[in-house]
C-alpha cells in the first residue's frame, strides 16, 4: 500500500510522533498503520531505555486536593521547554489525579503510568520521570504554586487568606521544620558544636564560647523553622507572632520544588548544540 499524506497525518494524530518518524514507520510496514503503531510502541520502549540515563531535573509540581487530603506530585523532564509542553503537563496532571483518587506509593504510581511514560518519551524525545509524591492532611488545606516549579500546601486553623500568605512565605523561605522545638536534637547538637568551634577560633575561651552559642542557637532554630522565621510580608515580626495576632495555627506544611536533590550536569551552550547535531546525524 502506498504511503500517502493522509496516512502519515492519521498516524501523527494517533501517536503524536513526528512526521518523519511516522513516514518511516509506515514505509517499513507498507502502509499498514496498525502494524506501524505496534512497531512504534516497541521501538518507543527501546528509546525510553536509552533516555533513562539522561538527567531529568526540570518539570512540574502538580497539586490536587480532595476534602481534607492533598497531594503534591513531581514529574520531571530534561528541559524547561518540555516542562511547558501541553502533552507533558497533561501527563503530569493525570498522574496527580490518580494519586489523589486513591492513596498510593510512588512505586505504584510509577508502575501504573509506565506505559504512558514510555509513549511520552517517544513523542517528546526526552527522559520523563514520575519522581515523587507527598500527601498532607488537615482540617483546612490551602495551596500555593510559584509557577510550576514550587508547590506548597499548608494545613491549619485560620482564615484562607492567612494560610495563603503563610504558604507564600514557605515557598519563598523554605523552612525545614514547623517550630524551633521541632528541630531534631542531633541537628541542634551538630550546629552547636560548629558554633562553639567558630567562637573558639575567634579567640574566645571554652566557657565564654558556650555562653555565646546560646544566643546563636536560638537564632539558628528560628531561622530553620516556620514560626521562628521573619515573615516575608512583615519582616519585623516572626510568622509565629503573626499567627498569634490572628489567633491562627499552622499544624503542618509541605513544600516541594522541581529538581531538589538532583545533581545537574553542567554543559556550555556550544557543547549542547554540538551534542544535538551529533544526535541528529546519528538518526
UniProtKB/Swiss-Prot annotation:
Transmembrane segments: none annotated. Residues 79-82 are annotated as: Involved in Mg(2+) ion dislocation from EF-Tu. The keyword Flavoprotein does not apply. GO terms for cellular component: cytoplasm. The keyword Protein biosynthesis applies. It is found in: Cytoplasm. Belongs to the EF-Ts family. Associates with the EF-Tu.GDP complex and induces the exchange of GDP to GTP. It remains bound to the aminoacyl-tRNA.EF-Tu.GTP complex up to the GTP hydrolysis stage on the ribosome. This is Elongation factor Ts. It comes from Pseudoalteromonas translucida (strain TAC 125). The lineage of its organism: Bacteria, Pseudomonadati, Pseudomonadota, Gammaproteobacteria, Alteromonadales. The gene is tsf.
Amino acid at each position: 500500500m502506498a504511503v500517502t499524506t493522509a496516512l502519515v497525518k492519521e498516524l501523527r494524530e494517533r501517536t503524536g510522533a513526528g512526521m518523519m518518524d511516522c513516514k518511516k514507520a509506515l514505509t517499513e510496514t507498507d502502509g499498514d498503520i496498525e502494524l506501524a503503531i505496534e512497531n512504534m510502541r516497541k521501538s518507543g520502549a527501546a528509546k525510553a531505555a536509552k533516555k533513562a540515563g539522561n538527567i531529568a531535573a526540570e518539570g512540574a509540581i502538580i497539586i490536587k486536593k480532595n476534602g481534607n487530603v492533598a497531594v503534591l506530585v513531581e514529574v520531571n523532564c530534561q528541559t524547561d521547554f518540555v516542562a511547558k509542553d501541553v502533552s507533558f503537563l497533561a501527563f503530569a496532571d493525570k498522574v496527580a489525579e490518580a494519586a489523589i483518587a486513591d492513596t498510593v506509593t510512588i512505586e505504584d504510581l510509577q508502575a501504573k503510568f509506565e506505559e504512558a511514560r514510555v509513549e511520552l518519551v517517544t513523542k517528546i524525545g526526552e527522559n520523563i520521570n514520575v519522581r515523587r509524591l507527598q500527601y498532607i492532611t488537615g482540617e483546612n488545606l490551602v495551596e500555593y504554586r510559584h509557577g510550576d516549579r514550587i508547590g506548597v500546601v499548608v494545613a491549619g486553623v485560620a482564615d484562607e487568606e492567612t494560610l495563603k500568605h503563610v504558604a507564600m512565605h514557605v515557598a519563598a523561605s523554605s523552612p525545614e521544620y514547623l517550630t524551633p522545638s521541632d528541630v531534631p536534637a542531633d541537628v541542634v547538637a551538630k550546629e552547636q558544636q560548629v558554633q562553639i568551634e567558630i567562637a573558639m577560633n575567634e579567640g574566645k575561651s571554652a566557657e565564654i564560647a558556650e555562653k555565646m552559642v546560646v544566643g546563636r542557637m536560638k537564632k539558628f532554630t528560628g531561622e530553620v523553622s516556620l514560626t521562628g522565621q521573619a515573615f516575608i510580608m512583615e519582616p519585623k515580626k516572626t510568622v509565629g507572632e503573626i499567627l498569634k495576632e490572628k489567633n491562627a495555627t499552622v499544624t503542618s506544611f509541605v513544600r516541594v520544588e522541581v529538581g531538589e536533590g538532583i545533581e545537574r550536569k553542567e554543559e556550555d551552550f556550544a557543547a549542547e548544540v554540538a551534542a544535538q547535531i551529533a544526535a541528529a546525524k546519528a538518526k
